[in-house]
């Protein structure tokens, strides 16, 4: 600690480097050795675990490995543990030769290597098998002990007489003795299948292996004894699942004292405890194991909160269950924990504390406690009868315990240390001989129980003595873990003579035994028993995993190896191989391919004599990809009952499969959904029915759930066939839909009424009524012939499967997109056709260059063209091309042409189609295809073509009738090679073509199984495949590179290479070689996906392997693929995947469900979930209290308890509230001022008509000129259409910009660049030396103004801080309505990171001098923070504010918490002149950087705020993230203490610029007013350059502060702004509601009398008079009291406020606390009023007397 203090003291001095040099020197060597020994990248969450195990892992390595932590454990075992213990010549068994030679280089005592092929996989791992056993005195068996039994190991010692000791590594989870769920799932997982344990290291399924489940027996035996051999078994070390064992021949002489020490062993487990079993139920121990910290915190929480609801324990558990350190806890355990806490919350210790008890009281307690004992002694007959019964029950047992020992148990049944002493005394009588072989088998299975603590009664129960029947009757209820007691060792066998000791006659001891028995059955228990039972259940001991090891006695031994392994091989070539390997021999040269490192213990490397059967890994079947969004039908409040189908709820004879959609019963009389904007179906039906569209909609509301009638699909796409089916049931009709020359039938089959709807596919699709002349007849034959291609497409089948489309869409071209591409081609920026002008001399027609120029001219006058279009899309290799190729071979589709992006893909089409040579013109690359014509246009890999190519193709070929698109939106897009091309400026084709993708085929015939497993992809390729690295370069291989420059270099060297982007669409039979270089990190996820999915056989990575390290700067997708981890497509393509309707099997039938909007309803019917067991009410009122189980009132304090209801709080937020009552009364209360009235007469006004001035106030102008455009959208800050006005030529709302985020979609995006400052990366903001220097300057300047010593630190006042916590809770509960808090329940969601802030725009119409007649203005951004931040740091700011209010000099004025009257009084007292200096800032909040954080930290440390709160504040400020990106540590409106920190920062900056120690100064946020004309300090120019602020000071006579003109006479509201507000209110009709607030503001200056004219500039006299004229005309008699001379009493102000519907900030500040409380519950407060309320609440509630 002393060294740390020295480091902290010298860290900011010139001695920093000198004192830290020794630390650096000692760390360098350790770091270097760690990097060399452990080179693999261990997951960051496992690094602390390995460090706690004593393994020096740095976490700075970069070599990837699929299970790096296990590899690190193995390296530590070999090169640290074994290498240091090997001090004699030793042999190593079962190890790769390469690994052995590395170990031999580390320690030369490792002399020989012996491997034996016991499994087919061993032939690959062990190239030189041994044929004999080693001869050394010490063996090292590497990761194979779990495959050998004690019989075989004893046989090894018998076969090797020279063998003295054997070191062996064992991989087995210790907790497998009690559960099949891992206690460390980050490190390993396992499952148990009968006698096999399947082990998976670090989630790497490919590295999982099987081993015998009884391998755990090695950790339970302490010795192996045979008739001729004695071996001791020692567990040297345990590193999680890896254990190092030493088996050696026992010494002839042993210390006799060692036999008295129990051989107990324990293992490292999470800090946990075991919950008790429920009454009469048995829950597995694994599901009762919970974190100890969570249990202790929940135990305290349920007893500390005053109002505990049934949901609060579950809410508390939720705040803990998502923590990564608790991922070992099962969901059942969390459920049991919250249930247990809920049901035991009311239990309290059965104790009492009474002082000065009299002897008589003690005697009464003694008699009461021993009443049954006295009764038993008084009735010998009863005693004899009971004891005779107990003796008779024991006669069936041949062996029993002595009564003298049993009486202790009867007197104190299973309580206290006495029982443990009793059981220990009995256990000492047991023979300590080793277990026999049969007993050992049973014993090893029974001994694996959680190790008890010394004084745990449950521990003694876990040994479970087999007592007599009487003792069993006296046993208490089961304790956690007691279900294991039936498996423990019987001890009664150790007392052969116990039955003879039951003969003594009855004595007083027997009376005591009967007393205990009667108490057990009749009750009550003794007070001590009750207390012990309470502690046993509610304070259980910590969980410890361990057991007692026992010796094992064997009758015989088995051979260590099969006889076949020790026979010389028959082959001469193999027999010639040396055996064993000599130490000097080097391993053969390794292959050039870099092998994937092996797991810590795999079956292939550690198979033994009888290995467990190894089954090859198989890829699990993947479920179909379903929607990630839950259906809202489950939570629909308008329904009742479970989810069912419409056909089940409303039975009728519907057409098949038309009424199977999910539905619920509608509650009668529920609110009706608003009429839909897209009502073409209702209009079409109404034309054929007597009902109007509104009546049809009302009928739907009686049947359909509200969620279905307000769904986004219905609002955006219109009504569909589900609504048509519901109407058919209501009105009993059947309907026919004629769509794309097909007829679909819906409704009631037996209905006599038949309706017809004509559906136009669009876009947008549309329902219409049939032409009356046709009378609903189907389309004519001529129309059917014209659409024969559509019918053929929809009916085409290949191998019984349909094309993956749902309909034939209509596509309309955009000539502007075609013109862009044609211009770029003409100028040579895209394509090469313009370079082919020389070919014109070889042909009679125009050259390609001329034809492109002609096409460019045609685009200038081209009109949009509509054609039929289908889009086949799917994963790489899903078979999009093959069905289209078969379709084109049919007669209907013979007139086609195919467009491909590359020549390679064109060649594949030619070979697959196998057409005659004269048809080769039908296959073209994208440029030459523009010069050809055909009715059917097929475009393969559409997204690899330039943007606008589809539009240009339709203009170039007017004969096209049908377009077939093939492509995958997840793969790469086209990118021009010319920097001058403007094609990139067009919008992407992906969002444009996504609506035409009906289905996305999510399977593959191409990729091998190992690649398909990464994407959870159904795979039809039988090849397993591989993903490896290689150091070789094969010139003729399929080399995929990142850039064209590498391609050119490769071609110059004669090597085959193609860019990853160019390979899209190609299929390789041979492996794909992916080249890694610095451009790999720049690859998009689309290109990475292309590279991984080209080959049928596998993937090789070559080049720079650091890009596979999963670190910053590497390729994430490549890293995941190489490590075998799953690749989730939504993580890489979130904007695309969620819009795709994925299918995982070929389409065999199509849905006939339609909607009138753009897309049909193509999704399959969702699965209907089972009805819930306990349905909750649809709405829970905020005052619902029936779920409250504990409601404690304050025991002391004021008569009126200052507590607000917390019943409406979300359970996750309830845990954040302290629920501390404010008990200390405030020593300061608000008293009305006794100062004289400002003026006893009313001012004389030069009368001026308000409406006359208002008529000419607003200049005539075009408001649209002030608007801005953002992404083709116009802002809406000056709306004027359909707005009423009557006092001027335009609506008065045009006076200033209005911010309405709901109606202005450009408001927030256009304001971001001005209101927010972003960090360049996601890394935290780093405090610079300049920030530290400037922050100290600001702090000293601020202390100078307050006349404080900056070096003084005040002691922390804990009692006062508790009061601040209570006030903060009170303010958070009272500042918002209960409904608002419920609606924002997500703010306390534990899944919301507390460093994440949601930014949204503030809705306001700000009217002041700066905004009147101003231009477009950026909105104010508000930050929505987590409740944890507000409730944790809020008390800190209130604590600081309290000290600042008390110590603030009188000449410094902070406006927060003060009323306009307070401002007037302060001005009258301190201001001597109207001359002033004001200041304005540019981007005040955004310009506060690291220096503001340093300043805030120094302010908190001055008051000794706890360091954990300071660290939290710094962490939040430097790590803020938003939905738009990471922010700098700027000031955010919404963070705790925004106003205080802004005001302090402003004051500190002003004092750096001017000397304010004696200058009257008013500050409020970024606003300031300095009395007089001041001169800057001499050092101000230097300090100014360090600040990021841009100041705009000005000296003038009439200065504004917070909207008021100030002077020695007082203050007056700016009449210009007030006049503008009155105009706006008069025009929009809200003047009646707002008049009380505006009148109150006006009365502040009006009360000054004639002196008010001295404060106003002369040009504002007319506006003051006009305002007075308006109030005289419009104010009521009661409101005009405010205009009378003198001060208005508080009661009158409160009455006026409570009757108003609008409260302004100044008016709100003058109200009483009672009125403010009523107003806050009456309607939602504005955020400005919320911030104003905090200091007022503190003024009334905080005990100022506590401050010393």
From Swiss-Prot:
Residues 433-507, 569-633, 767-786 are annotated as: Disordered. Residues 491-500 have a biased composition (Polar residues). One of its GO terms (biological process) is methylation. Residues 1002-1138 form the (+)RNA virus helicase C-terminal domain. PROSITE patterns: ALPHAVIRUS_MT (PS51743), PEPTIDASE_C21 (PS51738), PSRV_HELICASE (PS51657), RDRP_SSRNA_POS (PS50507). Its EC number is 2.1.1.-, 3.4.22.-, 3.6.4.-, 2.7.7.48. SUPFAM superfamilies: DNA/RNA polymerases, P-loop containing nucleoside triphosphate hydrolases. The record marks 775-776, 1156-1157 as: Cleavage. The active site is at residues 680, 766. Residues 844-1001 form the (+)RNA virus helicase ATP-binding domain. The lineage of its organism: Viruses, Riboviria, Orthornavirae, Kitrinoviricota, Alsuviricetes. Residues 627-781 form the Peptidase C21 domain. Residues 458-475, 601-616 have a biased composition (Low complexity). Belongs to the Tymoviridae non-structural replication polyprotein family. Residues 58-219 form the Alphavirus-like MT domain. Keywords: ATP-binding, Host-virus interaction, Hydrolase, Methyltransferase, Modulation of host ubiquitin pathway by viral deubiquitinase, Modulation of host ubiquitin pathway by virus, Multifunctional enzyme, Nucleotide-binding, Nucleotidyltransferase, Protease, RNA-directed RNA polymerase, Thiol protease, Transferase, Viral RNA replication. This is Non-structural replication polyprotein. Residues 579-600 have a biased composition (Pro residues). GO terms for molecular function: ATP binding; cysteine-type endopeptidase activity; mRNA methyltransferase activity; RNA binding; RNA-directed RNA polymerase activity. Residues 1474-1580 form the RdRp catalytic domain.
């Amino acid at each position: 600690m002393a060294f740390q203090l020295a480091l902290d003291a010298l860290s900011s001095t010139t001695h920093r480097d000198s004192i830290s040099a020794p630390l650096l020197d000692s760390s360098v060597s350790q770091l270097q050795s760690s990097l060399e020994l452990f080179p693999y990248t261990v997951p960051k969450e496992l690094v602390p675990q390995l460090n706690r195990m004593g393994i020096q892992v740095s976490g700075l390595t970069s070599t990837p490995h699929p299970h790096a932590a296990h590899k690190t454990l193995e390296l530590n075992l070999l090169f640290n543990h074994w290498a240091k213990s090997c001090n004699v010549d030793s042999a190593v068994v079962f190890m790769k030769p390469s690994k052995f030679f590395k170990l031999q280089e580390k320690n030369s005592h490792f002399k020989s290597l012996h491997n034996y092929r016991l499994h087919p996989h061993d032939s690959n791992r062990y190239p030189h098998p041994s044929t004999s056993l080693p001869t050394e005195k010490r063996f090292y068996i590497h990761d194979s002990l779990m495959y050998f039994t004690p019989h075989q190991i004893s046989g090894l010692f018998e076969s090797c007489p020279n063998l003295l000791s054997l070191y062996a590594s064992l991989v087995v989870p210790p907790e497998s003795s009690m559960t099949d769920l891992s206690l460390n799932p980050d490190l390993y997982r396992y499952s148990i299948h009968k006698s096999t344990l399947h082990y998976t290291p670090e989630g790497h399924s490919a590295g999982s292996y099987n081993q015998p489940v009884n391998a755990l027996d090695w950790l339970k035996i302490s010795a192996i004894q045979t008739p001729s051999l004695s071996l001791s078994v020692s567990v040297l070390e345990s590193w999680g699942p890896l254990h190092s064992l030493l088996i050696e021949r026992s010494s002839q002489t042993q210390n006799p004292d060692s036999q008295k020490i129990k051989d107990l062993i324990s293992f490292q487990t999470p800090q946990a405890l075991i919950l008790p079993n429920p009454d009469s139920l048995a829950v597995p121990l694994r599901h009762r194991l919970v974190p100890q910290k969570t249990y202790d915190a929940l135990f305290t929480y349920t007893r500390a909160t005053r109002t505990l609801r049934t949901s609060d324990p579950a809410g508390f558990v939720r705040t803990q269950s998502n923590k990564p350190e608790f991922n070992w806890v099962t969901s059942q355990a969390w459920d049991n924990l919250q249930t247990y806490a809920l049901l035991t919350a009311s239990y309290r210790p059965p104790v009492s504390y009474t002082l000065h008890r009299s002897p008589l009281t003690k005697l009464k307690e003694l008699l009461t406690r021993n009443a049954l004992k006295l009764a038993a002694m008084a009735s010998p007959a009863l005693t004899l009868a009971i004891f005779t019964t107990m003796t008779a029950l024991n006669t069936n047992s041949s062996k029993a315990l002595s009564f003298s020992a049993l009486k202790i148990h009867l007197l104190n049944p299973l309580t206290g240390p006495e029982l443990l002493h009793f059981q220990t005394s009995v256990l000492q009588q047991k023979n300590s001989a080793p277990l026999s072989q049969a007993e050992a088998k049973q014993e090893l299975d029974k001994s694996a129980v959680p190790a008890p603590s010394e004084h745990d009664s449950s521990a003694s129960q876990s040994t479970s003595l087999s007592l007599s029947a009487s003792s069993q009757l006296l046993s208490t209820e089961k304790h956690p873990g007691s279900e294991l007691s039936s498996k423990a060792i019987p001890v009664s066998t150790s007392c052969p003579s116990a039955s003879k000791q039951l003969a003594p006659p009855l004595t007083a001891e027997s009376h005591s035994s009967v007393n205990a028995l009667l108490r057990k059955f009749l009750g009550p228990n003794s007070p001590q028993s009750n207390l012990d039972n309470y502690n046993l259940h509610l304070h259980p001991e910590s969980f410890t995993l361990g057991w007692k090891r026992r010796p094992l006695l064997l009758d015989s031994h088995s051979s260590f190896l099969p006889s076949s392994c020790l026979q010389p091989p028959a082959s001469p070539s193999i027999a010639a191989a040396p055996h064993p390997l000599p130490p000097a021999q080097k391993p053969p040269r390794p292959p050039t391919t870099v092998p994937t490192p092996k797991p810590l213990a795999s079956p292939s490397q550690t198979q033994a004599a009888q290995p467990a059967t190894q089954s090859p890994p198989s890829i699990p079947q993947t479920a179909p990809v379903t929607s990630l969004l839950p259906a809202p039908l489950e939570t629909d409040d308008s329904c009742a009952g479970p989810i069912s189908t419409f056909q089940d709820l409303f039975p009728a004879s519907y057409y098949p499969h038309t009424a199977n959609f999910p539905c619920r019963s509608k509650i009668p009389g529920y609110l009706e959904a608003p009429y839909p904007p897209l009502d073409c179906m209702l209009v079409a039906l109404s034309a054929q029915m007597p009902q109007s569209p509104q009546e049809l909609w009302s009928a739907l509301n009686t049947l359909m759930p509200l969620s279905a009638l307000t769904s986004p699909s219905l609002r955006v796409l219109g009504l569909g066939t589900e609504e048509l089916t519901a109407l058919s049931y209501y009105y009993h009709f059947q309907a026919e839909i004629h769509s794309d020359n097909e007829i679909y039938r819906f409704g009631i089959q037996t209905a006599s009424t038949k309706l017809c709807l004509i559906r136009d596919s669009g876009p947008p699709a549309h329902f219409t009524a049939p032409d009356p002349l046709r009378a609903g007849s189907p389309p004519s034959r001529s129309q059917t012939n014209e659409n024969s291609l559509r019918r053929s497409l929809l009916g085409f089948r290949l191998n019984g499967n349909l094309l993956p489309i749902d309909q034939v869409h209509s596509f309309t071209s955009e000539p502007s997109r075609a013109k862009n591409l044609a211009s770029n081609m003409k100028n040579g920026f895209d394509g090469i056709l313009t370079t082919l002008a020389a070919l014109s001399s070889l042909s009679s027609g125009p050259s390609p260059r001329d034809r492109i120029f002609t096409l460019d001219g045609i685009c200038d006058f081209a009109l949009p063209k509509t054609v039929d279009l289908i889009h086949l899309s799917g994963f790489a290799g899903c078979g999009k091309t093959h069905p289209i190729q078969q379709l084109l071979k049919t007669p209907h589709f013979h007139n086609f042409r195919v467009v491909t992006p590359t020549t390679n893909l064109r060649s594949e089409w030619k070979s697959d189609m196998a057409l005659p040579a004269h048809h080769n013109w039908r296959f073209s690359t994208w440029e030459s295809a523009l010069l050809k014509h055909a009715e059917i246009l097929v475009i393969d890999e559409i997204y690899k073509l330039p943007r606008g190519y589809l539009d240009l193709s339709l203009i170039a070929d007017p004969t096209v009738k049908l377009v077939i698109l093939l492509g995958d939106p997840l793969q790469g897009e086209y990118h021009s090679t010319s920097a001058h091309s403007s094609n990139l400026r067009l919008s992407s084709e992906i969002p444009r073509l996504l609506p035409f993708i009906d289905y996305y085929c999510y399977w593959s015939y191409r990729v091998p199984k190992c690649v398909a497993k990464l994407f959870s992809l159904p795979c039809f390729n039988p090849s397993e495949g591989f993903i490896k690295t290689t150091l070789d370069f094969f010139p003729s291989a399929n080399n995929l590179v990142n850039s064209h420059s590498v391609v050119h270099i490769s071609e110059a060297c004669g090597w085959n290479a193609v860019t990853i982007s160019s390979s899209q669409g190609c299929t390789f039979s041979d492996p794909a070689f992916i080249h890694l270089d610095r451009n790999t990190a720049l690859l998009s996820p689309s290109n990475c996906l292309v590279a991984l999915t080209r080959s049928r056989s596998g993937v090789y990575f070559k080049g720079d392997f650091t890009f596979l390290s999963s670190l910053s700067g590497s390729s994430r997708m490549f890293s995941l693929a190489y490590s075998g981890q799953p690749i989730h497509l939504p993580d890489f393509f979130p904007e695309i995947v969620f819009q795709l309707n994925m299918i995982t099997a070929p389409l065999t039938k199509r849905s006939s469900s339609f909607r009138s909007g753009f897309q049909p309803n193509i999704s399959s019917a969702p699965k209907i979930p089972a009805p819930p067991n306990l349905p909750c009410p649809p709405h829970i009122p905020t005052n619902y209290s029936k779920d409250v189980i504990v409601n404690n009132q304050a025991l002391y304090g004021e008569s009126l308890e200052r507590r607000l209801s917390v019943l409406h709080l979300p359970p996750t937020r309830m845990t954040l509230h302290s629920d501390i009552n404010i008990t200390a009364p405030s020593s300061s209360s608000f008293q009305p001022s006794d100062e004289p009235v400002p003026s006893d007469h009313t001012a004389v006004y030069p009368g001026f008509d308000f409406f006359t001035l208002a008529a000419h106030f607003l200049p005539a102008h075009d408001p649209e000129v002030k608007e801005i455009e953002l992404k083709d959208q116009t802002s809406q800050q000056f709306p004027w259409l359909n707005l009423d006005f009557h006092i001027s030529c335009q609506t008065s709302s045009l006076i200033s910009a209005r911010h309405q985020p709901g109606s202005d979609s450009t408001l927030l995006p256009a304001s971001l660049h001005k209101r927010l400052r972003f960090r360049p990366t996601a890394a935290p903001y780093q405090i610079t030396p300049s920030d530290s220097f400037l922050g100290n300057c600001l702090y000293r300047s601020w202390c100078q103004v307050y006349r404080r010593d900056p070096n003084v630190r005040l002691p922390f006042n804990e009692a006062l801080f508790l009061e601040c916590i209570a006030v903060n809770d009170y303010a958070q509960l009272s500042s918002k309505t209960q409904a608002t808090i419920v609606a924002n329940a997500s703010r306390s969601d534990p899944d919301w990171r507390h460093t994440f802030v949601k930014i949204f725009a503030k809705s306001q119409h700000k009217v002041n001098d700066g905004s009147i007649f101003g231009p477009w203005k950026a909105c104010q951004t508000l930050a929505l923070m987590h409740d944890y931040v507000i409730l944790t740091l809020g008390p800190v700011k209130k604590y600081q504010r309290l000290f600042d209010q008390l110590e603030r000099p009188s000449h410094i004025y902070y406006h927060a918490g003060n009323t306009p009257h307070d401002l007037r009084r302060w001005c009258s007292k301190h201001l001597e002149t109207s001359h002033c200096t004001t200041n304005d800032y540019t981007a005040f909040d955004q310009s506060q950087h690291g220096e503001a954080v340093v300043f805030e930290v120094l302010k908190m440390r001055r008051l000794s705020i706890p360091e954990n709160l300071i660290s939290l504040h710094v962490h939040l400020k430097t790590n803020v993230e938003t939905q738009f990106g990471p922010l700098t540590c700027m000031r955010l409106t919404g963070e705790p203490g925004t106003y205080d920190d802004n005001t302090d920062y402003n004051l500190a900056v002003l004092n750096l610029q001017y000397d304010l120690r004696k200058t009257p100064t008013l500050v409020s946020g970024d606003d300031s007013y300095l009395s007089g004309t001041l001169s800057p300090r001499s050092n101000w120019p230097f300090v100014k350059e360090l600040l990021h602020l841009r100041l705009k000071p000005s000296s003038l006579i009439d200065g504004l502060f917070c909207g008021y003109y100030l002077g020695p006479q007082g203050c007056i509201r700016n009449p210009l702004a007030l006049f503008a507000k009155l105009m706006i209110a008069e025009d929009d009709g809200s003047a009646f509601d707002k008049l009380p607030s505006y009148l109150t503001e006006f009365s502040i200056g009006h009360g000054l009398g004639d002196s008010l004219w001295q404060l106003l500039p002369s040009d504002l006299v007319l506006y003051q008079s006009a305002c007075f004229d308006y109030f005289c005309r419009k104010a009521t008699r009661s409101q005009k009291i405010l205009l009378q001379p003198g001060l208005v009493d508080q009661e009158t102000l409160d009455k006026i406020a409570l009757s108003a519907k609008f409260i302004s900030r100044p008016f709100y500040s003058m109200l009483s606390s009672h009125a403010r409380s009523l107003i806050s519950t009456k309607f939602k407060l504005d955020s400005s009023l919320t911030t104003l309320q905090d200091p007022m609440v503190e003024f009334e509630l905080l005990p100022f007397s506590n401050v010393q």
